[in-house]
Amino acid sequence: MKPNIHPDYRPVVFHDTSVDEYFLIGSTLKTDRTIEWEDGNTYPYFTIEVSSKSHPFYTGKQRVLHKEGRVANFTRRFGQLGKGAK
């Protein structure tokens, strides 16, 4: 491998602003903002809008939408039109 071509991998604090949760995770993300973590150390800080704490798939609040097929949708909308014309 070539030396000095990979970004630095370091701990970064991610803040899910939708549920006010913080995560300390290793990342190569570059940011100028910092925050003091629970252990007393200062880490780079990055805000996110969706994480495993707020995404409906992971929280179990997912809604399942049943989509009809194109033929079923057509039949539902226009199926009665041809029956009275005979």
From Swiss-Prot:
Gene Ontology MF, one: structural constituent of ribosome
Organism whose genome encodes this protein: Vibrio atlanticus (strain LGP32) (Vibrio splendidus (strain Mel32))
Key words of the record: Ribonucleoprotein, Ribosomal protein
UniProt cross-references to InterPro entries, sorted A to Z: Ribosomal_bL28/bL31-like_sf, Ribosomal_bL31, Ribosomal_bL31_B, Ribosomal_bL31_sf
Biological classification of the source: Bacteria, Pseudomonadati, Pseudomonadota, Gammaproteobacteria, Vibrionales
Cellular component per GO, a single term: ribonucleoprotein complex
Designated name of the protein: Large ribosomal subunit protein bL31B
PANTHER family the UniProt entry points to: 50S RIBOSOMAL PROTEIN L31, CHLOROPLASTIC, LARGE RIBOSOMAL SUBUNIT PROTEIN BL31C
Family membership noted in the UniProt record: Belongs to the bacterial ribosomal protein bL31 family. Type B subfamily.
Keyword presence, rRNA-binding: no
Gene name as annotated: rpmE2
Description of how the protein assembles with itself and partners: Part of the 50S ribosomal subunit.
Annotated GO biological process: translation
HAMAP family for this protein: Ribosomal_bL31_2
